[in-house]
């Protein structure tokens, strides 16, 4: 990648948390990848790879892309899924793939997806907050949610 394209960074996480990542292609929004390691200083034992934003040159598991809508993700998963409501630090995350294709793409490997809603779309109170929602709920579909983050993570030995 070249030294100028692999930079340690600290990014904002949920609830005011600061997260150490290694950014690959940090200045190129279409190719940027954020990688975490068990030891960020030594960059050993890969724990996650994340793409986020509106567009990316990278494609996630099963053909998953940033910008995909709920219906597309259901098709890729092979079934509906459960996600959290919007408007809070953990809002829009898929919380249960319901045993679909994106549930576990390889032993010990998880796919995490976060949806967002466009700023110009008025979201109903029904899709806000911490409560779980089915991807099939009419209010979720009406919100025009799109994938804004895809993360692939690997469980560590102590998590098995």
Positions of the model-derived regions?
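Non-cytosolic coordination micro-motifs
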Residues: 1-15, 48, 53-160
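A glycine-rich, hydrophobic loop/mini-helix early in the fold
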Residues: 11-53
């Amino acid at each position: 990648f070249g030294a100028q394209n692999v930079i340690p960074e600290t990014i904002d996480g949920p609830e005011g948390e600061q997260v150490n990542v290694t950014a690959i292609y940090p200045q190129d929004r279409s190719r940027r990848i954020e990688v975490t390691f068990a030891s960020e200083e030594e960059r050993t034992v890969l724990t996650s790879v994340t793409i986020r934003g509106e567009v990316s040159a990278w494609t996630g598991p099963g053909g998953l892309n940033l910008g995909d809508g709920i219906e597309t993700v259901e098709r890729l998963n092979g079934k509906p899924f459960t996600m959290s409501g919007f408007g809070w630090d953990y809002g829009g995350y898929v919380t249960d793939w319901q045993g679909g294709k994106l549930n576990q793409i390889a032993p010990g490997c998880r796919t995490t997806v976060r949806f967002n809603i466009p700023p110009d779309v008025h979201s109903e109170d029904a899709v806000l907050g911490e409560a779980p929602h089915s991807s099939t709920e009419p209010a979720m579909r009406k919100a025009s949610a799109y994938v804004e983050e895809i993360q692939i993570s690997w469980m560590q030995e102590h998590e098995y």
